[in-house]
Amino acid sequence: MTTTLTRPTDGEGSVQVHQDPGLNIQEETLVIAVYGKGGIGKSTTSSNLSAAFSKLGKRVLQIGCDPKHDSTFTLTHKMVPTVIDILEEVDFHSEELRPEDFVFTGFNGVQCVESGGPPAGTGCGGYVTGQTVKLLKEHHLLEDTDVVIFDVLGDVVCGGFAAPLQHANYCLIVTANDFDSIFAMNRIVQAIQAKAKNYKVRLGGVVANRSADTDQIDKFNERTGLRTMAHFKDVDAIRRSRLKKCTIFEMDDEDEAVQAVRSEYLRLAQNMLDKVEPLEATSLKDREIFDLLGFD
């Protein structure tokens, strides 16, 4: 005989996860979670945005939340060990760790952490993200931070990888001007709607990436109540910066395209610091997106 337990929900159709109050990041810190379709450029966007905040004089911490642990390599110029790897080395006795074991200083003083994740097909990567925040709190590493950026795996919005939303003030969604990216963005909007019922996270807006135009994004924004916060065209200097393992702020100063991208990142960072008005966007049904996007 099966017994169904009545449990409070965390938004529609999911189980409420009660976060330990001790893991809350202090109110004065700006916390941003970056989501978007897999391969859309979230890590590039996150790292360059972290660099921009640092250029504005802010103390920045970027947390990579992907088992691939490639979120921060343009900041640190290398692949750094993950929190889960370091914890395994000490048999998960976190008290044996020092901050320098898992926090690495990158470009212009940006602090970088890669949470990592369990082997493919096992465990919960979102749990690892929670343990990473716990470890940072234990070592008082969040107390002297102005901005925290969570760079989150793909467009996965299950309970585990939605964990950064429990800490974030705002969610930025990175998208391209195409159907697949916007379809994924709609699913992320649905997740934000669910989490916003119980947590402080709100939609900040959209970052249009690798797109010459934004006509399809504009259609979706107008219909749902979203807005575009920044627009990065398909600039080859951004691709080359990844190959050089550096941020856009370390590329050739004489390149006008590089200067334009830098200015857009600095503008986005300043806008986020100026207290973005949170959005009350409404997601669409799958069929509605299908009918909305495209050409007549």
Curated annotation (Swiss-Prot):
It comes from the Bacteria. GO terms for molecular function: 4 iron, 4 sulfur cluster binding; ATP binding; metal ion binding; oxidoreductase activity, acting on iron-sulfur proteins as donors; oxidoreductase activity, acting on the CH-CH group of donors, iron-sulfur protein as acceptor. Pfam families: Fer4_NifH. One of its GO terms (biological process) is photosynthesis, dark reaction. Belongs to the NifH/BchL/ChlL family. The gene is chlL. Homodimer. Protochlorophyllide reductase is composed of three subunits; ChlL, ChlN and ChlB. This is Light-independent protochlorophyllide reductase iron-sulfur ATP-binding protein. InterPro entries: NifH/chlL_CS (IPR030655), NifH/frxC (IPR000392), P-loop_NTPase (IPR027417), Protochlorophyllide_ATP-bd (IPR005971).
